[in-house]
């Protein structure tokens, strides 16, 4: 949530920055008009409450003097009714103001490339050289199906499209990957959590998924329960601190969690219809940092660097790009995408997004800290995948495949596979 006071004081700057994210200036004008109406009602209500107090004092004085107070009593009743009516209007308008403000995305950082589409993202660096094959590399779903370690057909029978069964060494590889990620994250100072996989509406609002997810049907809601299956562990990890004041000395906080992620993939018809790239349910290891404002940009670089080390230790070629203003998530002020090389597609595909959300989520979730001067401030929140597990499995199957259909296990994962170095058909 953007600070209304900041919007009022920097209207044209806010309009210009949000225009790079596709927000029309009328949206800001509508918000401020409604906010002005709310503020005018507050003044009227406060004036009437002041008048009510004055009339009440006059009634008391008349009664002490044993004089007739009926006219003043009638006046006070009318004032009280007017106050009640104004307060009801105020409540309705306050909801409208919050709703309009809740639909505005975060302001982009000044060095984010400006574009309303993904075109224009800036590549920062690459690591590793994509392998040159002396045979035509197969897609990961072909490899998995031929080895009997991925079963999309039975998953479709049981649940529908965009689901998968991991079988045998496929399940072991998936487990090896996420245990490796969690161990690396723990070693880097992240505190591991096991979170709820369903959250309430306030939590989804706090991290910025609602109201957009409700309107676009991007998630899975549990009917009549007020719960939603999490699209990422970012939601419960950040909301752990919702409505709390954190001790300053505890900042920055780094937490991590493995969880399933549930996505309806609304609007993705025809895209990545095969394989592990775009699923309705997939495992993901998430990383979240909560920091003081002056720490957050350095923490974003550290978060991104750590995500890179995971790919480096797995020997997977990747690149890092800075997303454009129009391609970032709703809550982000700046995002680095890590894209891993997928040989069968002959291109890099996203495997992690590392974002600084500044105080945007903290305002929605009311997460604050008290600074050294005793002043309450909003924290900054950051998040990043560390990493998407299914996409990592896909990248391993494709980058480590052999001509005979077998797959070599990355050296870092061999201990997690109980010494298995090659996955073959059984």
Curated annotation (Swiss-Prot):
<dbReference type="GO" id="GO:0016260">
    <property type="term" value="P:selenocysteine biosynthetic process"/>
</dbReference>
<keyword id="KW-0648">Protein biosynthesis</keyword>
<dbReference type="Pfam" id="PF02403">
    <property type="entry name" value="Seryl_tRNA_N"/>
</dbReference>
<dbReference type="Pfam" id="PF00587">
    <property type="entry name" value="tRNA-synt_2b"/>
</dbReference>
<dbReference type="GO" id="GO:0006434">
    <property type="term" value="P:seryl-tRNA aminoacylation"/>
</dbReference>
<feature type="binding site">
    <location>
        <position position="385"/>
    </location>
    <ligand>
        <name>L-serine</name>
    </ligand>
</feature>
<dbReference type="GO" id="GO:0004828">
    <property type="term" value="F:serine-tRNA ligase activity"/>
</dbReference>
<dbReference type="InterPro" id="IPR045864">
    <property type="entry name" value="aa-tRNA-synth_II/BPL/LPL"/>
</dbReference>
<dbReference type="InterPro" id="IPR006195">
    <property type="entry name" value="aa-tRNA-synth_II"/>
</dbReference>
<comment type="subunit">
    <text>Homodimer. The tRNA molecule binds across the dimer.</text>
</comment>
<dbReference type="GO" id="GO:0016740">
    <property type="term" value="F:transferase activity"/>
</dbReference>
<comment type="pathway">
    <text>Aminoacyl-tRNA biosynthesis; selenocysteinyl-tRNA(Sec) biosynthesis; L-seryl-tRNA(Sec) from L-serine and tRNA(Sec): step 1/1.</text>
</comment>
<feature type="binding site">
    <location>
        <begin position="232"/>
        <end position="234"/>
    </location>
    <ligand>
        <name>L-serine</name>
    </ligand>
</feature>
<feature type="binding site">
    <location>
        <begin position="350"/>
        <end position="353"/>
    </location>
    <ligand>
        <name>ATP</name>
    </ligand>
</feature>
<dbReference type="GO" id="GO:0005524">
    <property type="term" value="F:ATP binding"/>
</dbReference>
<protein>
    <recommendedName>
        <fullName>Serine--tRNA ligase</fullName>
        <ecNumber>6.1.1.11</ecNumber>
    </recommendedName>
</protein>
<dbReference type="GO" id="GO:0140096">
    <property type="term" value="F:catalytic activity, acting on a protein"/>
</dbReference>
<dbReference type="GO" id="GO:0005737">
    <property type="term" value="C:cytoplasm"/>
</dbReference>
<feature type="binding site">
    <location>
        <begin position="263"/>
        <end position="265"/>
    </location>
    <ligand>
        <name>ATP</name>
    </ligand>
</feature>
<feature type="binding site">
    <location>
        <position position="286"/>
    </location>
    <ligand>
        <name>L-serine</name>
    </ligand>
</feature>
<dbReference type="InterPro" id="IPR015866">
    <property type="entry name" value="Ser-tRNA-synth_1_N"/>
</dbReference>
<comment type="function">
    <text>Catalyzes the attachment of serine to tRNA(Ser). Is also able to aminoacylate tRNA(Sec) with serine, to form the misacylated tRNA L-seryl-tRNA(Sec), which will be further converted into selenocysteinyl-tRNA(Sec).</text>
</comment>
<keyword id="KW-0436">Ligase</keyword>
<comment type="similarity">
    <text>Belongs to the class-II aminoacyl-tRNA synthetase family. Type-1 seryl-tRNA synthetase subfamily.</text>
</comment>
<dbReference type="InterPro" id="IPR010978">
    <property type="entry name" value="tRNA-bd_arm"/>
</dbReference>
<dbReference type="InterPro" id="IPR042103">
    <property type="entry name" value="SerRS_1_N_sf"/>
</dbReference>
<dbReference type="InterPro" id="IPR002314">
    <property type="entry name" value="aa-tRNA-synt_IIb"/>
</dbReference>
<dbReference type="InterPro" id="IPR002317">
    <property type="entry name" value="Ser-tRNA-ligase_type_1"/>
</dbReference>
<keyword id="KW-0547">Nucleotide-binding</keyword>
<keyword id="KW-0963">Cytoplasm</keyword>
<keyword id="KW-0030">Aminoacyl-tRNA synthetase</keyword>
<dbReference type="InterPro" id="IPR033729">
    <property type="entry name" value="SerRS_core"/>
</dbReference>
<keyword id="KW-0067">ATP-binding</keyword>
């Amino acid at each position: 949530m953007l600070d209304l006071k900041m919007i009022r004081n920097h209207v044209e700057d806010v309009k210009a920055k949000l225009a790079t994210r596709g927000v029309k200036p009328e949206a800001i004008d509508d918000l401020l008009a409604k906010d002005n109406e709310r503020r005018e009602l507050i003044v009227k209500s406060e004036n009437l409450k002041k008048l009510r107090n004055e009339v009440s004092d006059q009634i008391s004085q008349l009664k002490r003097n044993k004089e007739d107070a009926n006219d003043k009593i009638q006046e006070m009743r009318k004032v009280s009714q007017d106050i009640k009516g104004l307060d009801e209007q105020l409540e309705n308008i306050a909801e409208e103001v919050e709703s309009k403000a809740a639909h505005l995305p975060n302001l982009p950082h000044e060095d984010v490339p400006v574009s309303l589409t993904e075109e224009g993202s800036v590549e920062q660096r690459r690591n590793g050289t994509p392998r040159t094959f002396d045979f035509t590399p197969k897609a990961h779903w072909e490899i998995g199906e031929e080895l009997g370690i991925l079963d999309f057909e039975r998953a479709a029978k049981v649940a529908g499209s965009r689901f998968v069964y991991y079988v045998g060494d496929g399940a072991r590889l998936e487990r090896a990957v996420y245990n490796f990620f969690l161990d690396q994250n723990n070693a880097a100072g992240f505190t591991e959590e096991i979170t709820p996989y369903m959250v309430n509406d306030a939590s989804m609002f706090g991290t910025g998924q609602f109201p957009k997810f409700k309107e676009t049907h991007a998630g899975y809601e549990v009917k009549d329960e007020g719960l939603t299956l999490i699209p990422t562990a970012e939601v419960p990890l950040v909301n752990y601190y919702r409505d709390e004041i954190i001790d300053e000395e505890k900042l920055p906080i780094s937490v991590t969690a493995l969880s399933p992620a549930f996505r309806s993939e609304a609007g993705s018809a025809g895209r990545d219809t095969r394989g592990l790239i775009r699923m309705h349910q997939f495992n993901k290891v998430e990383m979240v940092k909560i920091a003081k404002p002056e720490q957050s940009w350095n923490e974003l670089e550290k978060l991104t660097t750590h995500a890179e080390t995971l790919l480096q230790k797995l020997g997977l070629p990747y690149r890092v790009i800075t997303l454009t203003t129009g391609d970032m998530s709703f809550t982000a002020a700046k995002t680095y995408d890590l894209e891993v090389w997928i040989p069968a597609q002959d291109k890099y595909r996203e495997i992690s997004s590392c974002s600084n959300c500044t105080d945007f989520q903290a305002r929605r979730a009311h997460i604050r800290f008290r600074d050294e001067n005793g002043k309450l401030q909003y924290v900054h929140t950051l998040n990043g995948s560390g990493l998407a597990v299914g996409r990592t499995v896909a990248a391993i199957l494709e980058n480590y495949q052999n001509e005979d259909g077998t797959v070599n296990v990355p050296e870092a994962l061999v201990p997690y596979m109980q010494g298995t170095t090659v996955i073959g058909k059984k």
